[in-house]
Design a protein with these regions (language model features):
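Fungal secretory targeting signals
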Residues: 1-22, 318
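Conserved beta-strand elements of beta-rich interaction domains across eukaryotes
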Residues: 14-15, 159-160, 202
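Fungal extracellular Ser/Thr-rich, low-complexity intrinsically disordered regions
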Residues: 19-26, 231, 238-318
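Active-site catalytic motif of lipid deacylating hydrolases and related acyltransferases
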Residues: 23-108, 194-222, 231, 235
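Short, conserved catalytic or adaptor-binding loops enriched in Gly and charged residues
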Residues: 61-64, 145, 184-190
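Serine-dependent carboxylesterase/thioesterase catalytic core
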Residues: 94-113, 117-180, 185
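C-terminal catalytic-base region of ester-bond hydrolases, centering on the histidine
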Residues: 164-252
Length: 318
């Protein structure tokens, strides 16, 4: 069985300094939908290759009157770094960040999106470790956070496994370094909401020889993927009663600033903003509304206009 020691994703990548100095977006408002983005190796946060997916998906949701925001999964993607350590860090942080956000915003539907090394990370978030020594069974699909995931997308996945019902494109029946049966079984708990894009020529997910097939997913399939996500959102059951998810909060004048952007109210005033209901002494059963959330403008994606091609893939076999 192959063991990935170091896989450097193929790509026309921005300078390493940009990848390491661009700060991640680690929080979001309690919007109707929040997308968790997981970047590829050596890519910056808000990277120009994958961010069009966020813009397209949120644009279509907003056209339907829904609010939409995103969060970056934080992890190191330094070129030439310890690949398994990077994936483990990303998986741990992904589970932690998704769980924490769901606790803050239990009415928000979650979409997860990972590209290349980021697809490996997101696969591990959902299904546990893929060939690395990170010990986890993944995010329980029956947990509150797991149930909140309405759609999950993997693109050019390092651990792409052939012939899965959620595989799409002409690489659906191909694989390079597939997940073990036990890892795959855990990942497949999310099969109803999962989609994995793999082109036949992609060297990373399909063992092909066409570098461009790994680089152009979002140029070719962003519209298709974003429409699929919107369809999943429109066909999923609400996470909270309609009165909770759509009610406009009515804070008192003294605490109005505490609920701007759908953020969690402070403990002293939380009871006064629950869907306009009569305040209680403890606010123990707080349900935070989503629709009134205020979403800040998205940052400008990091451009790839002046990039250089970097290609390096290593495998160690046991």
């Amino acid at each position: 069985m192959s063991f990935i020691r170091n896989t450097i994703v193929l790509g026309a990548l921005s300078a390493l300094t940009a990848a390491q100095t661009t700060p991640p977006k680690l929080d979001a408002s309690c919007a109707d939908v929040v997308i968790f983005m997981v970047r590829g190796n050596d890519a910056p946060y808000h990277d120009g290759r994958t961010f069009p997916f966020v813009e397209a998906t949120c644009g279509k949701l907003r056209a339907e009157g829904k609010t939409c925001d995103y969060i970056d999964v934080q992890f190191d993607v330094t070129l030439g770094g310890d690949y398994c350590a990077q994936v483990a860090e990303g998986a741990r942080n992904g589970i932690s960040q998704i769980t924490a956000f769901n606790q803050k915003c239990p009415c928000s539907h979650i979409v997860v999106n990972g590209y290349s090394e980021g697809a490996h990370v997101m696969g591990d978030v959902l299904g546990g470790p893929g060939d690395c020594t990170f010990v986890s069974n993944g995010l329980d699909n029956t947990s509150s956070a797991g149930k909140a995931i309405a759609a999950a997308l993997l693109w050019g996945d390092v651990m792409h496994t052939a012939n899965q019902p959620y595989n799409v494109l002409d690489g659906a029946s191909k694989q390079k370094n597939p997940r073990s049966p036990s890892d795959l079984a855990r990942l497949n708990r999310y099969a109803p909401v999962l989609r994995s894009y793999c082109a036949a020529g992609d060297p990373v997910c399909a063992g092909g020889n066409t570098v461009a097939d790994h680089l152009n997913y979002f140029q070719l399939y962003t519209d298709d993927a974003s429409s699929w996500v919107v369809s999943k959102i429109n066909n999923v059951a609400p996470l909270c009663p309609a009165s909770s998810s759509s009610a406009v909060p009515t804070p008192t004048a003294s605490v109005s600033a505490s609920v701007i952007g759908g953020n969690t109210p402070t403990a002293t005033v939380s009871a006064s903003v629950i869907g306009g209901n009569t305040p209680t002494a403890t606010g123990a059963a707080t349900v935070y509304p989503t629709s009134p959330a205020v979403v800040a403008p998205f940052p400008r994606p990091i451009s790839y206009d002046t990039c250089v091609l970097k290609v390096h893939v290593e495998y160690c076999y046991e």
